[in-house]
Amino acid sequence: MTEREIELLGMRKENINEYEGDDSYYYVLDLVNGLTFITECNTQVENNDWNVDVFNTEPTIRFTNFAEVQGLLNKLSKAIVSNG
């Protein structure tokens, strides 16, 4: 998946050490409390081929296809029950 596709998913860019002049960053999306999607650091990406992981799972749950992640996020978003 490309970096542009990561942005289209609504993931936000997080700089790692911007105050130290480091250009490293990753993307994150907190869908709900306890369910976070995260990418690898840009320095680990080869050929603009990004992955999206479900944060803090064992074993790792990883997606490489934009349409799959987009579909999953759409389904999960529709299933969110508001407490208000």
Regions inferred by a protein language model and the residue ranges of each:
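Amphipathic alpha-helical segments
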Residues: 1-15
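Short intrinsically disordered terminal tails
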Residues: 1, 78-84
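Acidic, low-complexity, intrinsically disordered interaction modules
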Residues: 16-67
